[in-house]
């Protein structure tokens, strides 16, 4: 099962490396990884998307909590949460393809952020399934390049990750 693990850790050199090393040493796969500073400049928030049984996720959480730099660990998928991902996709857009791509981007609430004679660069934000559906909806042969951030998540309502 897919899990979104949110980790609050000290914002210092080597902290990210130790977390990634923990996953690697134990053979756990990281599907996506995002890291950014929080409202407290001394802390970073890491979002790890991984897969595994409940037992595996429990082991990952326990191992993460043992790292000195880790302040708090939460499996967001245990409760209500919001997940988003950003995708930039550059597509070939010539002739009648241009209007079709524009319509498809509009349907998926994407924005065309760069236009050249032969290409569109489209920005989409949403759940992984939405971004995957957009890729499925367009002609794959028109895709020139794709960049995705990976998942980021936050608990709903009063559920927060703070010290």
Language-model segments: residues:
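Long, contiguous binding/interaction regions
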Residues: 1-45, 49-163
